[in-house]
Amino acid sequence: MKKSNSTFKDVFFPVIFLLTSCISSCSDSDRKDKTTNSSTSVNIQFPFPTEHYDEALDGRLILLISKQTETEPRFQLRDDSKTCQGFGMDINDWKPNEPQRFDMEAFGYPIHSFKDLPSGEFFVQVLFHKYETFNRADGHVVKLPMDRGEGQQWNRAPGNLYSTPQKVTIRNGQFPSLTIKLDQKIPPITEPEDTKYVKHLKIKSKLLSDFWGRDMYLGAHVLLPEGWETHPNVKYPLAIMHGHFPSDFGGFRTTPPDPELKSDYSERFNVEGYNRIVQQEANDFYKTWTGPDFPRVIAVKIQHPTPYYDDSYAVNSAAQGPYGDAITYELIPYIEQQFRGIGEGWSRFVYGGSTGGWESLAVQVKYPKEYGMCFAACPDPIDFRAYCLVNIYEDENAYYEEGIFRKTLVAGHRDYLGNVNATLRDMNYRELVLGTKGRSGQQWDIWEATYSPIDEEGYPKRIWDRLTGKIDKEVAAYWKENYDLAYILKRDWAKHGKDWTNKIHLYCGDMDNYYLNNAVYLAEEILSETTAPYYNGEVDYGDRAEHCWNGDHDNGNHISRLRYHRMFIKKYVEKVHNVAPKHADLKSWRY
């Protein structure tokens, strides 16, 4: 997610108190996902935004409080200690001319209750995340935020409303009486245009439209090989890069870095001028892609955002529907037909990091004959005995390591030296502010939306109680049989091993920030014990390497993360003879 460069001035607004209807922060089924103290109301009210909408609205109202003025508060809610304060509450059927207000029942992060807020001067901003109603084929009616071209980002979603930040004084946990107008509306996304090399497409998916009860689409950004137009009889392998929602085919730039580009600083990598490095790497890739020695393949980045996240995790699931089938049997064949792909399983290979790493291994496991090879870097947990630092099968609680006389919070994020800057509990609490019923659009919620069965309302079942951390063992058993990739490999090796051999390649830093290396260790043990046939792939680790190390021992993460295409396309070409049938054309596309 990109960071905003916007700033705001110290603006005071008239203070008005209106007697308004009260709203609850959670539905009855999610009542446990909030803290409750109804002794005092927070007198912040919101007139209905009639200048933007004239119909009743459903959604999530998010109140943000900050001291920092370099960016708007809506861009400051994060997992570490630099976060702003947030509170969230659901709004259902908000009718015109009916103002709403917050009360003390709204759940907060990192401070959970209004009454515990420190005294002082702060900036306050409110954002309304708009939901839509879906009448799904399974009979459930659910309210969710439809993606609107931004890749499921609550603070950037077109159509969402937000207020101009204003200064307030908080004393002893009490707000002054305020009226906050949702006077700003996020504009639509501008779609990228086709170029000589990059083409953009979108198709209506019948499978997904049938499931969701409305038209649903899949998209792709397609990078054509050098010489595609002048070699009309050549068919090409398909290089599919999985990962978070791509707004364009990033990392490919036909011109040198912008000489007027203002240098920035990467907090993650501690590098000055990182934006210039990114542009230079993109231009270098263009030169490599069009150069005489690079393999000629079609490279693709897929758009498959769902009402739960910026992508579907590329598999079928109870809450999100048949995204795995839609991508594999609708979108990919369409791309191959449009741009002369070879269209056989051996000629399709997948790669990606983090989310894209899990997806790459998942589609190889779930569709063993439809894909010829996978390269999975820093994958999300591929063995749920190490769901980050939680063993969902044996641990009783996800948030604490518990003994007779004490309990210790479980870490959620570390640096390469092991310094912890976020706990798993707080990461989950932040998501709870952004949305109940799995609707935050964030990491822990999408794992549940992907792996879990649905509850009686049609939303994903929790793997653990979001307030207490108590693990639901029935849900864990469902996860194991359907989405624990390492377990499935072991369980089904006798059946599918011949279709997995030579195809699985895993890479992870041994100091991954999210402890993802732990699951890779367990998966490696399973793979190393395979026989008849042996898996004959690769597992590699980077010493003290953080998220998202991808097998590059020569460059730091800040460089290697920009070279996925160059690295894995070459690896595929080096190994393709191991998976291609005798009749396969391995020459015509090597001009």
Where are the regions that the model predicts?
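Non-catalytic cap/lid and distal C-terminal segments of serine-dependent acyl enzymes
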Residues: 67-107, 112-591
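Small/flexible residues
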Residues: 4-5, 11, 33-34, 62, ...
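A diffuse structural propensity rather than consistent per-protein peaks
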Residues: 7-9, 13, 62, 322, ...
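Contiguous beta-strand segments within globular domains
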Residues: 38-48, 54-62, 217-221, 240
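A short, compositionally biased domain-edge/stem linker segment
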Residues: 21, 26-33, 48-50, 182-190, ...
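Bacterial Sec-dependent N-terminal signal peptides
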Residues: 1-41
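Short, solvent-exposed linear motifs at loop/edge-of-secondary-structure regions
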Residues: 53-69, 329-330
